[in-house]
Design a protein with these regions (language model features):
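A solvent-exposed beta-alpha-beta segment
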Residues: 125-126, 133-140, 150-160
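Charge-patterned, long linear interaction tracts outside catalytic cores
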Residues: 209-222
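Helix-rich interaction surfaces within compact, conserved domain-sized segments
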Residues: 158-212
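Arginine/glycine-rich "motif VI" loop of SF2 helicases in the C-terminal RecA-like domain
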Residues: 20, 120, 145-154, 172
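Short, solvent-exposed amphipathic alpha-helical segments in soluble enzyme
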Residues: 142-147, 195-196
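Short active-site oxyanion
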Residues: 49-50, 105-106, 124-126, 152-157, ...
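N-terminal cysteine/histidine-rich coordination modules
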Residues: 1-67, 71-75
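Extended interfacial segments that mediate partner engagement and assembly in macromolecular machines
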Residues: 58-137
Length: 222
């Protein structure tokens, strides 16, 4: 294994808590910053020796509690006491940024009527509802979206990981509750960032399995 936790002969990394070997996308990389404080490297691009931890809140909390960062780096470091919450905020920001970028590119519509119209035209690739959206509006849009997706043999990804305030800030307009993105790279990034945030928050499902991926015909928030 190399100094960054890579298993010899492959791209797998070893979790500093469970010691399990997993692909990088199922882990979070941390590095020591210039001041000696541990820093989440969600994009996996920061220089320096990395410490890899399973991408769940539970694992990050355990890494802090067990001193896994100092042990892996073999040096004294400073670990923020709210590291697990910091990671969650950064993941939510990445999802909001993905929504913002897609919106600026003209690939997102917002508002119940516009989302409903895009679904009807078959142009919606992913729905984004605020976590605090009213259940009736969500249900109406979801039923139509899933029915059309089922008829076409396509997935119906639905994201509910951001609050209305977070969606409004990302899209630069007030009171955003419902949004939809057309297909392409922007929609794919939305789905992947939501999947990552959801897995971090929920960890393992009862029974030991991982949470199902966002890009199935289901609500990522259920």
């Amino acid at each position: 294994m190399d100094c960054d936790g890579e298993v010899d002969g492959g791209p797998l990394r070893q979790c500093a808590v469970s010691r399990a070997h997993k692909p990088p996308e199922e882990l979070i990389r941390f590095v020591a910053g210039p001041g000696g404080a541990i820093v989440p490297d969600l994009a996996r691009r920061l220089p320096g020796r990395g410490v890899w931890v399973d991408a769940t809140r539970e694992a990050v909390v355990a890494a802090v509690r067990k001193g896994a960062f100092a042990r892996s780096l073999k040096r004294q470091i400073s670990v923020p006491p709210d590291l697990a919450s910091m990671v969650e905020r950064l993941m939510a920001r990445r999802l909001a940024d993905a929504l913002s970028i897609a919106n600026k590119a003209g690939l997102v519509v917002a508002g119940f009527a516009k989302v409903d119209e895009l679904i009807t035209r078959g142009g919606a690739a992913v729905l984004v509802h605020a976590a605090d959206a009213a259940a009736d509006g969500v249900a109406k849009l979801d039923r139509k979206f899933k029915a059309l997706a089922d008829a076409g043999g396509k997935p119906a990804p639905i994201i509910r990981e951001l609050t209305g305030a977070e969606m409004s800030l990302a899209m630069g307009r007030p009171n955003v509750i419902h949004a939809a993105a057309v297909g392409g790279g922007a929609a794919h990034r939305l789905i992947e960032e939501a999947r990552r945030l959801r897995r971090y928050r929920l960890g393992q499902e009862p029974g030991g399995g991982a949470p199902p991926p966002v890009n199935q015909t289901q609500d990522v928030h259920d």
